[in-house]
Every structure is written in C-alpha cells, then in structure tokens.
Amino acid sequence: MHFHDCFVRGCDGSVLINSTSNNQAEKAAIPNQSLRGFDFIDNLKALLEAACPGVVSCADTLALAARDAVVTIGGPFWNVPTGRRDGTISNATEALNDIPAPFFNFTDLQTSFANKGLNLTDLVLLSGSHTIGITHCGPLTFSNRLYNFTGKGDQDPALDSEYAANLKKNKCKTLSDNTTIVEMDPGSFRTFDLGYYKQVLKRRGIFVSDSSLTKNSFTNAYISRLVSGPVSEFFKEFAAAMEKMGRVEVKTGSVGEIRKVCTVVNS
C-alpha cells in the first residue's frame, strides 16, 4: 500500500481517501483493488488523533505501518523520517496511469521508476517485496499469460511451462476467474526472504513485470547476486530502497494538510 501511495502524487496518504459521489479516488483504481489493511490504518490514525490530535499525518502513519509490518513478518528494519503532510487530491485515473502495471515490460518499468527518481537497483529491491505478495487470477493481472498471451489462445513462452500448467490446474482454471488468490512466492509468502527472486530466475515470476527483470543484463545479474548472497545483504539493501522510496515527492511545510481522518480531506 505504501508503494502504491508513493507512486501517485508522492507519499502523501492519498491512497487512503474514499471516493465520493463526484470523485473516483485512488482506492477505486484497478491496481489498488487488491490492497488490504485500510481499516487497520484508519484505526491507527484514530488512536494517534486521540493521543496527539493534528500532529501525525496519514502519510506518516502509512509509512511507519509498512515498515513495522515488514519487521513483524521477519523482514528488515529501516528508518522512517517523519514530517510528511497529507495530500488533498486522490484520483483513480492518476493511480491507473502512475502505478506500474503487472503487464509492464522492462522499458515500461524503467521509465515508471525513473519518473519517481528511482533507479534499476531500486526496481529490483522494491520488487522483492513480492516475496510476501499475493495477487488474483484474471486477465488484468496475469491469466492472459496462461490462456491468451498474444490474443491467439496461447501461453507466454517466458513462463515456465510446468508452473503454468500447475496454475491452470489448481488456481486459475479459466481466463475469466478474477477472484482466486495466488501467492507470488509459493510456499513461503509469509516469510520475508529471497524466495521471490529464486522464482523469477526459474521463470516463475507471475507477472510479466516480474519476468521482465530477467530481460536486462544489469537487473538479471543483480538478482543473481542477491540470491547467491546472505539474506542479510538483501535486507540491508531493501531497507535502503524503502527509505529512499519513502521520500518520493513528499509534502512538507505548508503544502497539504494533516488529515483528521484518513478517508476524507479536512473540511
């Protein structure tokens, strides 16, 4: 959720805002419809407002919660500089345009990350969060890779055939299924580790964007280096990338506001 927030107007908590009768907010955008934990963030904010009203922004609450969630599941700790202010604009179309899509090729990914001041190292490291990721079957996520990759009823040759067969048999049994949940790092998606990268190197990255990481010599070599090294090295580098992402286009000073409730802008 923190990643999805930072890629649209910066890390400003705009992903937390609800839609209204005259505005479709970021939550309504297809890339955000699989996000979970909004109620948890809202509850955290309510506790913060009760203790120190008007001090801690929703953007900071989300950034801190993302860090603590990773630590809780056994991942690394990183510093989260605070002082972000909340945005007042949340637009579904912007989210659709700005959040990297699961069908992005390498060039698309590189451009998307560069637009936010992030480099190829950041791309690889932040993708590593897919080690605890889940997705849904469906043509807008990855099922076209199984059933209709080029529009001719074919399968993506870049996807390991045994893995594809298993997905078709046990998970995404039809192209139209868009509800079945699939682990992005099967067998260890509750463990923050190097499993995702190992899947990618086996041609078992579930998204086109996952597979795209092996299409570039630098990113492919970087993944191989991470996999061959200790998990502690990945943790160190992932933490640095998360701290860097948390600074993307932040609002400070008099820009934005400190929202009282994360789901609505202040009146």
Where do the language-model regions lie?
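Catalytic cores of secreted/periplasmic or lumenal enzymes
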Residues: 1-267
